[in-house]
Amino acid sequence: MSPIKAIKAAYFSPSGGTKRAAVLLCEQFGLPAEYIDCTCPPAKLPAAIPVAKDELLVLALPVYGGFGPRVEGLFSQLRGQGGPCVILAAYGNRDYENALAAAARQMKEQGFVCVGGIAPITPHVSAPSLGAGRPDEEDMPVFAAFARKVLAACENEPLRPAALPGDADAPRKPLRPTGRSRDKERCNHCGRCVRVCPAGALNELLEVDSEKCINCMACRFACPTYAWQFDTTAVRACLEENFSARRAVEWFAE
């Protein structure tokens, strides 16, 4: 097909780690890039976000329990025209499991051909020492090699989907419970947490819908008075004991 002229990067990044990884990857393509922040309830986004056939979609998401975020309608606005996309599944040094496969299938259903996938490591939201500082300088040559391979794959006619690991039909695991609480003395009721919650799990009374909450901690990161707290002591100890060894960035491209 004709050469790619630009990048469109759609990302979900409550803590900022996935966005940073997406920006670092997009810089490797050497093309103009437009960034679309999907870290909000899908209803707040345009009904349709078209992506031209000569644009490469970079879909960037964090991994929670082996899949992308469990947010109804996430990325559903993206509309492909048979053009290429790549999936970036950022994870906190444990495993990305089925995230690439599941996201690739969704994008196929929305009109894209997934020509590649990459799984960089970013700081774990519950155990920040895992993936601290990553992606780092050691990861950049890997990002560059992936970008070169993707651009070459985009010249195939027709485009060929990459073989990505994982099972899009695997059952989702329940999220590990965290001790979520709000310090009512610190809280000034500014409503910022309600506005930034990407899952729509907080109402105006600051009540949490536990069925919707994905433990992304966007509320905690956004709170100007540090009123929201998550007790991740047990989860952090388990992760640090079993998953502290540095993992390499893995990528796949046709």
Residue ranges and their predicted role:
Residues 182-183, 188-214, 218-235:
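Iron-sulfur cluster-binding cysteine motifs and their immediate structural context
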